Amino acid sequence: MSILNHFFDYKPEVLALDEKAMELCQPYFRHMEEIRDFNQLKMLKAFADTQMSSTDMLGTTGYGLWDTGRAKLEQIFAEVMGAEDALVRSQFQSGTHTLAVALFGLLRAGDTLLAATGRPYDTLEGVIGLDGKGKGTGTLMDYGVQYDEAPLKADFTPDYDLIAKKAPGAKVCHIQRSRGYLQRNAFDLETIRKIADTARAANPDIIIFVDNCYGELTQTQEPCQVGADIAVGSLIKNPGGGIAPTGGYIVGRKDLVELCAYRLNAPGLGKELGCTLETPRDMYLGFYYAPGVVCEAIKTAIYAQCMLELLGKNPVPRYCDDHNDIVTCFDAGTADALIGFCQGIQAASPVDSYAAPEPSPEPGYTDEVVMASGSFTQGSTIELSCDGPLREPYTCYLQGGLNFAASRAGVLLAIQKAYFKD
């Protein structure tokens, strides 16, 4: 009997698929483990270089002045991310909030934001003010910032000619590394480099801005090492390692990070303020563990992609592709299959496993959405979770997985509930 059936009741045909998928995935697992090992040693070196000590994890209150633990954590982030400086704070509430702080920090009235990888995902539309969203609430457009975009081509690749044409009039060139709700692969670092080179050749002063959410530590380099001036992400995604309870980061050129700090705090205060309370230990530990956790999440993605491909689905990316974020998307085919898949993920979660996700209206979505997230941290996407809108072709987005053993069980249960019903 498979060890899996000691704890969950899987059908023989599901276990047969599992056996085949595990065999096919081994070389791709080993590749990710090599990336993990490189990044873990890079992480260890950064911790040692800062001479981080146990007292740095104690936290501060009030203003947070002279917080050496906060300063050392930011130094570690900067070194690991290949940047001059970093702003790593628990005061960032989400990835969207962190992105908003960075954009407002860099852009002024009359400046133009160029979205070089097409329209950003939904939550940023309200920050920018696209299509009148959030009008009068303090969007970038409310403050006189202009918006332009270079849509992706039909094959979801950047339109470099259009980027070169539009870059001279822009202050910031925005690159979204992950797919959002498009069925495309995440952009690899060479693509980010080429976008940066193209925009900078047309406008040497343009600021290359990368939304790095879901992409951290998936490769051995980061965007600031391939031409980005600033990169932004969330600590309840990859770099928090499933341990950081909240927060975000901004890394990049020192002068630009300082501008972002003025926006987060106040002009004249910059990085000097911001108490850490009881968060430093979790933020240090989460970042230290992040290379291993990201590896487990991508192994989960590779395995899920292989299983889905064996079932005749067409996941993006494929299990044999290079992986530049932790997200998998595929067309479930029917509403029942999408709901069943989400219910299987939830049933094999450590938190709220007894819940059965059902479609419901969600703010910002035109269709009902079904979501599964049995996570320790609310909204965490480095923990195994999935979601999808109830509209054809019933696309499901799967991400995360703190450890492969448990995530494998979840994927199997999801596939069984979706495609092997009695």
Region spans (language model):
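N-terminal small-domain helix-loop-helix segment of the aminotransferase-like
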Residues: 63-69
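Conserved C-terminal alpha-helix-loop-beta "cap" of PLP-dependent enzymes
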Residues: 309-422
